[in-house]
């Protein structure tokens, strides 16, 4: 897929004011960090001094603070233009690294449209508390981090995956404008990091589907197939956070009640978009939280689309946009309450294109696993299958 050429400019970075710790990976190694890493933040490990990725994450934090300062000082005005999607801003830091912000104005507008201020974004991702490392059951070699409050998800990406994201970004933004309650995870920024003259590393920031995390009892990554879709559950009493897969969910059902029809319709709309951009291998993330007795049957205060989502076209009715009444909760776009349980739901990973390599993989898997459900199929088949899974596993 051809990707438009990016327009790059380089500026010196303005460091955060004195009081923040400088980037260092060697100081205070040892017992202190190991004690903090094993504290009660179940299955997540603080990337503190002594951690092999501490220096990299500190550079991310410093770089993101400086990058967001630019968008705070120069907020984009007017409608989004093609230039906004092509812009690359590179900031050179005195500490010996460069951070690139890709399509910065487009993402600044997207953050504003979901009510996320630049001040909040900067404070959460910038220097201060260390990131938390999350060990994924994914086959990907990517590194996964959460901000300390677990609101935002940081994931390293390969260069070609970033090119796919940027190529689809205008249509992604258009889809979110048309369907503001979409289940698609909100992508908040795409960045590059290079130390000295080394190779660039790319990473993305997105809202965490599984937030707020308190009382979440189960987490799943669903693709709608069976091959290699089982994870051995953690032993009872283990603090390890595991994201389970399709076969672990096989005998379960999500009891969505009155929200089921909305959910199934939005799954159709979102997977249709992913099919149109020729993407597969995405996942439906599912987390479950049991409601307390005093929460069951209570209708939380709700607010309408036009009050909660900025930039929504008011010429369209809520029926056209498949809108629902949102709960008055953090991360409301990804939360649906059933009669007994609260569900955290979102579609993630839109970087795998159905090209020649995936077509070959499809043929090979069909030969190796005849008659079985494999992950690598055409985008149309993939979308239908995941929607079918949602229909079968909800009531």
From Swiss-Prot:
GO terms for molecular function: 1-phosphatidylinositol-4-phosphate 5-kinase activity; ATP binding. Highly expressed in brain and testis, relatively to heart, spleen, lung, liver, skeletal muscle and kidney. Keywords: ATP-binding, Cytoplasm, Kinase, Lipid metabolism, Membrane, Nucleotide-binding, Transferase. GO terms for cellular component: cell projection; cytosol; membrane. Gene3D superfamilies: 2-Layer Sandwich (3.30.810.10), Phosphatidylinositol Phosphate Kinase II Beta (3.30.800.10). Residues 37-394 form the PIPK domain. Disulfide bonds: none annotated. Residues 1-25 are annotated as: Disordered. One of its GO terms (biological process) is positive regulation of apoptotic process. It is found in: Cytoplasm; Membrane. May act as a scaffold to localize and regulate type I phosphatidylinositol 4-phosphate 5-kinases to specific compartments within the cell, where they generate PI(4,5)P2 for actin nucleation, signaling and scaffold protein recruitment and conversion to PI(3,4,5)P3. Interacts with type I phosphatidylinositol 4-phosphate 5-kinases, including PIP5K1A and PIP5K1B. This is Phosphatidylinositol 4-phosphate 5-kinase-like protein 1. The gene is Pip5kl1.
